[in-house]
Amino acid sequence: MVPNYSTEETVKRIHVDCPVSGRHSYIYIMVPTVYSIIFIIGIFGNSLVVIVIYCYMKLKTVASIFLLNLALADLCFLITLPLWAAYTAMEYQWPFGNCLCKLASAGISFNLYASVFLLTCLSIDRYLAIVHPVKSRIRRTMFVARVTCIVIWLLAGVASLPVIIHRNIFFAENLNMTVCGFRYDNNNTTLRVGLGLSKNLLGFLIPFLIILTSYTLIWKTLKKAYQIQRNKTRNDDIFKMIVAIVFFFFFSWIPHQVFTFLDVLIQLHVITDCKITDIVDTAMPFTICIAYFNNCLNPFFYVFFGKNFKKYFLQLIKYIPPNVSTHPSLTTKMSSLSYRPPENIRLPTKKTAGSFDAE
Protein backbone atom coordinates (compact mmCIF):
# COMPACT_ATOMS: atom_id res chain seq x y z
CA MET A 1 0.00 0.00 0.00
CA VAL A 2 1.42 3.38 -0.99
CA PRO A 3 0.40 6.31 1.22
CA ASN A 4 0.07 9.95 0.14
CA TYR A 5 0.42 12.27 3.11
CA SER A 6 -1.93 15.23 3.35
CA THR A 7 -1.72 16.88 6.78
CA GLU A 8 0.58 17.01 9.81
CA GLU A 9 -1.29 16.40 13.09
CA THR A 10 -0.68 14.54 16.37
CA VAL A 11 -1.76 11.43 14.53
CA LYS A 12 -0.83 12.09 10.92
CA ARG A 13 -3.53 11.55 8.32
CA ILE A 14 -2.80 9.56 5.19
CA HIS A 15 -4.65 8.47 2.08
CA VAL A 16 -4.09 4.91 0.85
CA ASP A 17 -3.95 4.42 -2.92
CA CYS A 18 -5.01 0.74 -2.77
CA PRO A 19 -7.34 0.66 0.27
CA VAL A 20 -8.43 -2.98 -0.13
CA SER A 21 -4.89 -4.28 -0.68
CA GLY A 22 -4.12 -7.24 1.56
CA ARG A 23 -7.40 -6.94 3.47
CA HIS A 24 -9.05 -10.38 3.49
CA SER A 25 -11.12 -11.94 6.24
CA TYR A 26 -9.15 -15.19 6.34
CA ILE A 27 -5.96 -13.25 7.13
CA TYR A 28 -7.55 -11.83 10.27
CA ILE A 29 -8.18 -15.37 11.53
CA MET A 30 -5.29 -17.46 10.24
CA VAL A 31 -2.37 -15.12 10.93
CA PRO A 32 -3.26 -14.33 14.59
CA THR A 33 -3.75 -18.06 15.18
CA VAL A 34 -0.30 -18.85 13.78
CA TYR A 35 1.24 -15.99 15.76
CA SER A 36 -0.31 -17.37 18.95
CA ILE A 37 1.05 -20.86 18.27
CA ILE A 38 4.52 -19.47 17.55
CA PHE A 39 4.36 -17.38 20.73
CA ILE A 40 3.41 -20.29 23.00
CA ILE A 41 5.85 -22.83 21.55
CA GLY A 42 8.62 -20.25 21.09
CA ILE A 43 8.43 -18.85 24.61
CA PHE A 44 8.37 -22.34 26.12
CA GLY A 45 11.13 -23.76 23.93
CA ASN A 46 13.53 -20.82 24.09
CA SER A 47 13.03 -20.45 27.84
CA LEU A 48 14.06 -24.08 28.27
CA VAL A 49 17.11 -23.43 26.07
CA VAL A 50 18.15 -20.49 28.27
CA ILE A 51 17.70 -22.54 31.46
CA VAL A 52 19.58 -25.56 30.13
CA ILE A 53 22.49 -23.59 28.69
CA TYR A 54 22.87 -21.19 31.61
CA CYS A 55 22.09 -23.48 34.55
CA TYR A 56 23.17 -26.91 33.31
CA MET A 57 25.83 -26.31 30.67
CA LYS A 58 27.34 -23.37 32.58
CA LEU A 59 28.47 -21.47 29.46
CA LYS A 60 31.63 -23.55 29.15
CA THR A 61 32.01 -23.24 25.38
CA VAL A 62 32.08 -20.51 22.76
CA ALA A 63 29.09 -22.05 20.98
CA SER A 64 27.02 -22.07 24.18
CA ILE A 65 27.48 -18.30 24.53
CA PHE A 66 26.26 -17.71 20.99
CA LEU A 67 23.34 -20.11 21.47
CA LEU A 68 22.29 -18.43 24.73
CA ASN A 69 22.26 -15.04 23.04
CA LEU A 70 20.33 -16.49 20.10
CA ALA A 71 17.63 -17.78 22.44
CA LEU A 72 17.51 -14.42 24.27
CA ALA A 73 17.14 -12.57 20.96
CA ASP A 74 14.27 -14.88 20.01
CA LEU A 75 12.58 -14.23 23.38
CA CYS A 76 12.89 -10.46 22.92
CA PHE A 77 11.02 -10.79 19.66
CA LEU A 78 8.45 -13.32 20.86
CA ILE A 79 7.15 -11.04 23.63
CA THR A 80 5.97 -8.61 20.93
CA LEU A 81 3.95 -11.24 19.04
CA PRO A 82 0.72 -10.80 21.07
CA LEU A 83 0.62 -7.17 19.92
CA TRP A 84 0.93 -8.19 16.27
CA ALA A 85 -1.63 -10.97 16.71
CA ALA A 86 -4.11 -8.47 18.15
CA TYR A 87 -3.25 -5.91 15.45
CA THR A 88 -3.99 -8.41 12.68
CA ALA A 89 -7.11 -9.77 14.37
CA MET A 90 -8.43 -6.19 14.62
CA GLU A 91 -8.02 -5.85 10.84
CA TYR A 92 -4.85 -3.77 11.14
CA GLN A 93 -6.34 -1.29 13.60
CA TRP A 94 -3.51 -0.28 16.00
CA PRO A 95 -4.87 0.57 19.49
CA PHE A 96 -1.63 0.48 21.49
CA GLY A 97 -0.22 3.95 20.88
CA ASN A 98 2.82 5.29 19.07
CA CYS A 99 5.43 4.14 21.62
CA LEU A 100 4.47 0.46 21.40
CA CYS A 101 4.21 0.80 17.62
CA LYS A 102 7.86 1.82 17.52
CA LEU A 103 9.07 -0.70 20.12
CA ALA A 104 7.20 -3.69 18.69
CA SER A 105 8.40 -2.88 15.18
CA ALA A 106 11.96 -2.41 16.39
CA GLY A 107 11.73 -5.76 18.18
CA ILE A 108 11.11 -7.51 14.86
CA SER A 109 13.97 -5.71 13.14
CA PHE A 110 16.31 -6.22 16.10
CA ASN A 111 15.62 -9.94 16.22
CA LEU A 112 16.14 -10.31 12.48
CA TYR A 113 19.61 -8.79 12.56
CA ALA A 114 20.69 -10.20 15.94
CA SER A 115 19.63 -13.74 15.01
CA VAL A 116 21.22 -13.76 11.58
CA PHE A 117 24.45 -12.20 12.89
CA LEU A 118 24.62 -14.79 15.68
CA LEU A 119 23.97 -17.66 13.26
CA THR A 120 26.71 -16.31 11.03
CA CYS A 121 29.16 -16.15 13.92
CA LEU A 122 28.19 -19.68 14.92
CA SER A 123 28.95 -20.94 11.42
CA ILE A 124 32.33 -19.19 11.47
CA ASP A 125 33.05 -20.65 14.91
CA ARG A 126 32.19 -24.15 13.66
CA TYR A 127 34.42 -23.63 10.63
CA LEU A 128 37.37 -22.57 12.78
CA ALA A 129 36.82 -25.37 15.30
CA ILE A 130 36.65 -28.15 12.71
CA VAL A 131 38.80 -26.96 9.80
CA HIS A 132 41.45 -25.11 11.83
CA PRO A 133 41.17 -26.65 15.32
CA VAL A 134 44.71 -25.84 16.49
CA LYS A 135 45.27 -22.41 14.96
CA SER A 136 41.87 -21.12 16.07
CA ARG A 137 42.25 -21.90 19.77
CA ILE A 138 43.92 -18.57 20.44
CA ARG A 139 41.04 -16.64 18.87
CA ARG A 140 38.16 -18.84 19.94
CA THR A 141 38.08 -17.82 23.60
CA MET A 142 35.18 -17.13 25.95
CA PHE A 143 36.21 -13.47 26.19
CA VAL A 144 36.19 -13.03 22.41
CA ALA A 145 32.78 -14.72 22.20
CA ARG A 146 31.29 -12.40 24.85
CA VAL A 147 32.71 -9.30 23.17
CA THR A 148 31.42 -10.53 19.81
CA CYS A 149 27.92 -10.93 21.24
CA ILE A 150 28.01 -7.40 22.67
CA VAL A 151 29.05 -6.06 19.26
CA ILE A 152 26.26 -8.04 17.59
CA TRP A 153 23.63 -6.59 19.94
CA LEU A 154 24.94 -3.09 19.29
CA LEU A 155 24.96 -3.60 15.51
CA ALA A 156 21.42 -5.00 15.61
CA GLY A 157 20.35 -1.97 17.62
CA VAL A 158 21.93 0.43 15.13
CA ALA A 159 20.34 -1.41 12.21
CA SER A 160 16.95 -1.06 13.93
CA LEU A 161 17.23 2.69 14.56
CA PRO A 162 15.53 3.65 11.27
CA VAL A 163 12.53 1.58 12.34
CA ILE A 164 12.32 3.38 15.69
CA ILE A 165 12.64 6.77 14.00
CA HIS A 166 10.31 6.34 11.05
CA ARG A 167 7.70 3.84 12.25
CA ASN A 168 4.64 5.69 13.57
CA ILE A 169 0.89 5.49 13.85
CA PHE A 170 -1.19 7.16 11.14
CA PHE A 171 -4.88 7.67 10.58
CA ALA A 172 -5.89 6.26 7.20
CA GLU A 173 -8.79 8.49 6.20
CA ASN A 174 -10.31 6.32 3.50
CA LEU A 175 -10.06 3.28 5.79
CA ASN A 176 -11.21 5.20 8.88
CA MET A 177 -8.64 3.48 11.07
CA THR A 178 -5.30 4.00 12.81
CA VAL A 179 -2.43 1.94 11.46
CA CYS A 180 1.17 1.32 12.53
CA GLY A 181 3.46 1.87 9.57
CA PHE A 182 6.27 3.80 7.92
CA ARG A 183 6.01 7.42 6.85
CA TYR A 184 8.06 8.31 3.80
CA ASP A 185 8.43 11.77 2.34
CA ASN A 186 7.31 11.74 -1.26
CA ASN A 187 10.81 12.62 -2.47
CA ASN A 188 12.73 10.43 -0.03
CA THR A 189 13.55 7.36 -2.09
CA THR A 190 16.84 6.70 -0.28
CA LEU A 191 15.11 5.70 2.95
CA ARG A 192 12.61 3.50 1.16
CA VAL A 193 15.30 1.60 -0.71
CA GLY A 194 17.69 1.53 2.23
CA LEU A 195 15.31 -0.13 4.68
CA GLY A 196 14.26 -2.81 2.22
CA LEU A 197 17.65 -3.57 0.74
CA SER A 198 19.38 -3.60 4.14
CA LYS A 199 16.97 -6.35 5.15
CA ASN A 200 17.69 -8.21 1.90
CA LEU A 201 21.47 -7.81 1.98
CA LEU A 202 22.53 -7.49 5.64
CA GLY A 203 19.64 -9.51 6.98
CA PHE A 204 19.81 -12.41 4.57
CA LEU A 205 21.98 -12.60 1.44
CA ILE A 206 25.43 -11.77 2.85
CA PRO A 207 24.98 -13.86 6.05
CA PHE A 208 23.57 -16.76 4.05
CA LEU A 209 26.57 -16.79 1.72
CA ILE A 210 28.91 -16.80 4.73
CA ILE A 211 26.94 -19.59 6.41
CA LEU A 212 26.79 -21.64 3.22
CA THR A 213 30.53 -21.20 2.59
CA SER A 214 31.43 -22.12 6.17
CA TYR A 215 29.40 -25.31 6.21
CA THR A 216 30.55 -26.28 2.72
CA LEU A 217 34.17 -26.11 3.90
CA ILE A 218 33.22 -28.03 7.03
CA TRP A 219 31.64 -30.74 4.91
CA LYS A 220 34.73 -31.02 2.74
CA THR A 221 36.82 -31.55 5.88
CA LEU A 222 34.42 -34.19 7.17
CA LYS A 223 34.37 -35.87 3.76
CA LYS A 224 38.13 -36.39 3.97
CA ALA A 225 37.62 -38.07 7.31
CA TYR A 226 34.91 -40.24 5.74
CA GLN A 227 37.42 -41.89 3.45
CA ILE A 228 39.59 -43.21 6.28
CA GLN A 229 37.03 -43.78 9.00
CA ARG A 230 35.31 -47.11 9.53
CA ASN A 231 32.38 -45.89 11.60
CA LYS A 232 30.59 -43.07 9.78
CA THR A 233 27.59 -42.79 12.11
CA ARG A 234 28.80 -39.68 13.93
CA ASN A 235 29.84 -37.95 10.71
CA ASP A 236 26.43 -38.75 9.21
CA ASP A 237 24.78 -37.04 12.19
CA ILE A 238 26.95 -33.97 11.71
CA PHE A 239 26.18 -33.88 8.00
CA LYS A 240 22.43 -34.11 8.66
CA MET A 241 22.74 -31.24 11.12
CA ILE A 242 24.64 -29.12 8.58
CA VAL A 243 22.06 -29.74 5.86
CA ALA A 244 19.23 -28.97 8.28
CA ILE A 245 20.80 -25.67 9.36
CA VAL A 246 21.38 -24.34 5.85
CA PHE A 247 18.09 -25.68 4.46
CA PHE A 248 15.94 -24.37 7.31
CA PHE A 249 17.61 -20.96 7.39
CA PHE A 250 17.25 -20.44 3.64
CA PHE A 251 13.72 -21.67 3.13
CA SER A 252 12.31 -19.99 6.24
CA TRP A 253 13.54 -16.56 5.17
CA ILE A 254 13.63 -16.52 1.35
CA PRO A 255 9.85 -15.99 0.84
CA HIS A 256 9.80 -12.97 3.15
CA GLN A 257 12.93 -11.53 1.57
CA VAL A 258 11.47 -11.85 -1.94
CA PHE A 259 8.25 -10.09 -0.98
CA THR A 260 10.18 -7.45 0.94
CA PHE A 261 12.01 -6.64 -2.28
CA LEU A 262 8.70 -6.46 -4.16
CA ASP A 263 7.39 -4.12 -1.47
CA VAL A 264 10.39 -1.85 -2.10
CA LEU A 265 9.41 -1.73 -5.76
CA ILE A 266 5.88 -0.78 -4.74
CA GLN A 267 7.17 2.00 -2.49
CA LEU A 268 9.28 3.29 -5.38
CA HIS A 269 6.20 3.24 -7.65
CA VAL A 270 7.94 0.77 -9.95
CA ILE A 271 4.91 -1.43 -9.30
CA THR A 272 1.67 0.57 -9.36
CA ASP A 273 -0.93 -2.07 -10.21
CA CYS A 274 -3.25 -2.54 -7.22
CA LYS A 275 -3.74 -6.21 -8.14
CA ILE A 276 -0.02 -6.90 -7.76
CA THR A 277 0.05 -4.79 -4.61
CA ASP A 278 -2.80 -6.88 -3.22
CA ILE A 279 -0.86 -10.08 -3.93
CA VAL A 280 2.20 -8.72 -2.14
CA ASP A 281 0.25 -7.38 0.85
CA THR A 282 -1.76 -10.60 1.10
CA ALA A 283 1.28 -12.86 0.94
CA MET A 284 3.44 -10.77 3.27
CA PRO A 285 1.79 -11.88 6.56
CA PHE A 286 2.15 -15.53 5.58
CA THR A 287 5.81 -15.12 4.62
CA ILE A 288 6.32 -13.48 8.00
CA CYS A 289 4.71 -16.51 9.67
CA ILE A 290 7.12 -18.82 7.86
CA ALA A 291 10.08 -16.68 8.94
CA TYR A 292 8.82 -16.49 12.53
CA PHE A 293 8.70 -20.28 12.73
CA ASN A 294 12.49 -20.04 12.69
CA ASN A 295 12.28 -18.58 16.20
CA CYS A 296 9.81 -21.22 17.26
CA LEU A 297 11.61 -24.30 15.94
CA ASN A 298 15.23 -23.44 16.80
CA PRO A 299 15.00 -25.20 20.21
CA PHE A 300 13.91 -28.44 18.56
CA PHE A 301 17.17 -28.53 16.62
CA TYR A 302 18.96 -28.68 19.96
CA VAL A 303 16.80 -31.59 21.13
CA PHE A 304 16.99 -33.65 17.94
CA PHE A 305 20.68 -33.09 17.19
CA GLY A 306 22.19 -32.30 20.59
CA LYS A 307 22.95 -35.39 22.62
CA ASN A 308 24.28 -33.45 25.60
CA PHE A 309 21.49 -30.91 25.36
CA LYS A 310 18.95 -33.73 25.29
CA LYS A 311 20.51 -35.18 28.43
CA TYR A 312 20.28 -31.88 30.31
CA PHE A 313 16.80 -31.24 28.95
CA LEU A 314 15.60 -34.55 30.38
CA GLN A 315 17.22 -33.67 33.70
CA LEU A 316 15.31 -30.39 33.74
CA ILE A 317 12.01 -32.12 32.94
CA LYS A 318 12.66 -34.62 35.75
CA TYR A 319 13.53 -31.76 38.16
CA ILE A 320 17.08 -33.00 38.61
CA PRO A 321 19.30 -30.17 39.96
CA PRO A 322 22.02 -28.85 37.63
CA ASN A 323 24.85 -30.19 39.80
CA VAL A 324 23.55 -33.77 39.62
CA SER A 325 24.62 -35.70 36.54
CA THR A 326 24.53 -39.39 35.77
CA HIS A 327 27.51 -38.97 33.44
CA PRO A 328 29.73 -36.21 34.90
CA SER A 329 32.51 -36.88 32.40
CA LEU A 330 30.45 -35.95 29.38
CA THR A 331 31.32 -32.67 27.69
CA THR A 332 28.90 -29.88 26.86
CA LYS A 333 30.09 -29.14 23.37
CA MET A 334 27.41 -28.12 20.90
CA SER A 335 27.09 -27.18 17.28
CA SER A 336 25.54 -24.06 15.77
CA LEU A 337 21.97 -25.24 16.03
CA SER A 338 22.48 -28.50 17.88
CA TYR A 339 25.39 -30.16 19.64
CA ARG A 340 28.80 -28.71 19.14
CA PRO A 341 30.91 -30.88 16.83
CA PRO A 342 34.35 -32.01 17.96
CA GLU A 343 36.84 -29.29 18.79
CA ASN A 344 39.59 -31.29 17.16
CA ILE A 345 38.82 -33.84 14.51
CA ARG A 346 41.47 -36.50 14.56
CA LEU A 347 42.08 -37.82 11.12
CA PRO A 348 42.78 -41.44 12.08
CA THR A 349 46.10 -43.08 11.51
CA LYS A 350 46.42 -46.79 10.91
CA LYS A 351 46.59 -47.37 14.67
CA THR A 352 43.47 -45.32 15.36
CA ALA A 353 41.49 -46.00 12.25
CA GLY A 354 38.20 -46.18 14.12
CA SER A 355 38.48 -43.05 16.23
CA PHE A 356 36.88 -39.70 15.62
CA ASP A 357 36.81 -37.96 19.00
CA ALA A 358 36.87 -34.56 20.57
CA GLU A 359 39.52 -33.24 22.84
Swiss-Prot record:
GO terms for molecular function: angiotensin type I receptor activity; angiotensin type II receptor activity; bradykinin receptor binding; protein heterodimerization activity. SMART domains: 7TM_GPCR_Srsx (SM01381). Its main location: membrane. Glycans are attached at N4, N176, N187, N188. Residues 56-61, 126-141, 217-239, 305-359 are cytoplasmic. Keywords: Cell membrane, Disulfide bond, G-protein coupled receptor, Glycoprotein, Membrane, Receptor, Transducer, Transmembrane, Transmembrane helix. This is Type-1 angiotensin II receptor. It comes from Gallus gallus (Chicken). The gene is AGTR1.
